[in-house]
């Protein structure tokens, strides 16, 4: 009897030792489901939230903004602190964005950031003298093309509603020239033009960095005299009020 008990106890101890020495097998290989979930999470993190125009308008000043827009026109390219920059007038179907001194290569400026080119812009919303703009901007070229037609804002002159069209490509019809003067008093720099409409005066500008002295519009505006009536096209820039950057003037024949 004692022998049987001893044998049983030895067997039990052997079983316990075997059990204690056995460890579960752990694999380092992730399952297909786990890999797919990780990839989806990474894509979600990398996905950029692009703002609508209304969201851009509602954004706080100095906050980061991301918009998709189309180049409409551009001022001269130059180097600032060794970095190439240019200022762009851009617009999509819902509104316009003024990109101030956005860094870009000369090659991109000449060959890619052309009228109609679609870009995604990341920068910071800022304001200067009433002009809302995007500064410290970076861009990504996208597929797509859009060139805006001038929207007639003549009936918006003198209204608070005009500001909601800021920076858009616009037309103002039947404007009477009151005064034309050159910045610094001589041709080559900006031209300041005061127009009258419905008893009020509005200061527009030929921006030399946009349309220089060798352009048709610069010469045409320089030849205007007080009393001339013209239709005007340009970008509804803002400087303490509407200060359209003129791109075209067309004389209105008196009847």
Question: What kind of region is each of these model predictions?
Answer:
Residues 21-23:
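Bacterial signal peptide processing site
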Residues 25-26, 157:
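Hydrophobic/aromatic hotspots within intrinsically disordered, low-complexity regions
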Residues 41-255:
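OB-fold single-stranded nucleic acid-binding module
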């Amino acid at each position: 009897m004692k022998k049987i008990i001893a044998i049983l106890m030895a067997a039990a101890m052997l079983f316990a030792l075997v059990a204690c020495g056995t460890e579960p097998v752990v694999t380092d290989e992730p399952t297909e489901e786990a890999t797919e979930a990780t990839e989806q999470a990474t894509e979600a993190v990398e996905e950029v939230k692009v703002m609508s125009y209304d969201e851009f308008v509602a954004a706080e000043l100095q906050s980061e903004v991301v918009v998709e827009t189309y180049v409409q026109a551009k001022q001269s390219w130059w180097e600032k602190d060794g970095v190439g920059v240019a200022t762009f007038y851009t617009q999509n179907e819902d509104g316009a964005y003024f990109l101030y001194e956005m860094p870009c290569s000369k090659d991109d400026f000449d060959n890619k950031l052309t009228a109609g080119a679609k870009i995604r812009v990341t920068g910071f919303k800022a304001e200067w003298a009433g002009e809302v703009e995007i500064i410290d901007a970076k861009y990504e070229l996208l597929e797509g093309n859009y060139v805006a037609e001038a929207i007639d804002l003549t009936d918006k002159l003198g209204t608070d509603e005009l500001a909601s069209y800021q920076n858009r490509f616009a037309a103002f019809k039947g404007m009477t020239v009151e005064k034309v003067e050159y910045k610094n008093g001589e041709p080559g720099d900006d031209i300041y033009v005061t127009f009258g409409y419905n008893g009020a005066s509005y200061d527009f500008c030929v921006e030399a960095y946009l349309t220089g002295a060798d352009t048709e519009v610069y010469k045409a505006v320089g030849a205007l005299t007080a009393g001339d009536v013209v239709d005007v096209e340009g970008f509804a820039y803002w400087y303490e009020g509407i200060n359209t950057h003129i791109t075209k003037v067309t004389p209105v024949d008196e009847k």
